[in-house]
């Protein structure tokens, strides 16, 4: 029996698609936040990335859904009207700041239990070349519990993730006894 007739590794079938090449200066950038306003450092990093190619920027705000009640969706765990309004104002302010710099900007709002999964879905579906997110300084135990958004996004998609470190505003010294 010839080698080609055997069932095994070398079956006929459709070829796998070649991975798409991501341009070095990105032409489409996703600027994302999870339930908080954009910090100036994050906007500066997005502007630095977008400037060489005058990239198109999409500003995405993710509202956090906090879980289920007895396995059923509970309206009290969904983002309320005030949270939506605060998130929309923050996203619009960031978009206006980028438009003042001359960039073409689109705005998106979404809600999700798993924000990193939603950001990765947006990046894949709309073919972005770079993702910029804030990486606030947190203790290690909190990173383990809450997860690291930048690492989770990078694990879910092949688009480069630029995590901008944000220093903590709290004083984390030990309290006097």
Question: Residues of each region from the PLM?
Answer:
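Small/aliphatic-rich secondary-structure junction motif
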Residues: 18-76, 99, 103-106, 156
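Local beta-strand N-terminus motif with an aromatic residue
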Residues: 26, 127-129
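Short, solvent-exposed amphipathic alpha-helices that sit
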Residues: 45, 83-94, 118
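CheY-like receiver
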Residues: 49, 118-122, 126
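Short, hinge-like loop/turn segments at secondary-structure boundaries
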Residues: 74-79, 123-126, 149-151
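Glycine-rich, Arg-bearing micro-motifs that act as flexible, cationic patches
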Residues: 130-156, 170-174
């Amino acid at each position: 029996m010839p080698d080609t007739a055997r069932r095994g590794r070398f079956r006929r079938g459709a070829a796998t698609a070649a991975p798409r090449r991501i341009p070095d200066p990105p032409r489409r950038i996703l600027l994302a936040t999870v339930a908080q306003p954009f910090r100036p450092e994050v906007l500066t990093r997005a502007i630095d990335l977008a400037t060489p190619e005058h990239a198109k920027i999409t500003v995405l705000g993710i509202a956090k859904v906090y879980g289920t009640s007895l396995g059923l969706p509970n309206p009290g765990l969904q983002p309320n009207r005030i949270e939506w309004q605060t998130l929309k104002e923050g996203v619009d302010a960031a978009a206006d700041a980028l438009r003042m710099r001359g960039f073409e900007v689109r705005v998106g709002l979404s809600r999700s239990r798993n924000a990193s999964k939603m950001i990765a879905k947006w990046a894949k579906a709309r073919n972005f070349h770079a993702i910029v997110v804030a990486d606030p300084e947190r203790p290690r135990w909190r990173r383990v519990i809450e997860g690291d958004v930048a690492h989770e996004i990078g694990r879910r998609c092949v688009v480069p993730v630029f995590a901008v470190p944000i220093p903590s505003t709290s004083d984390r010294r030990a309290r006097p006894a």
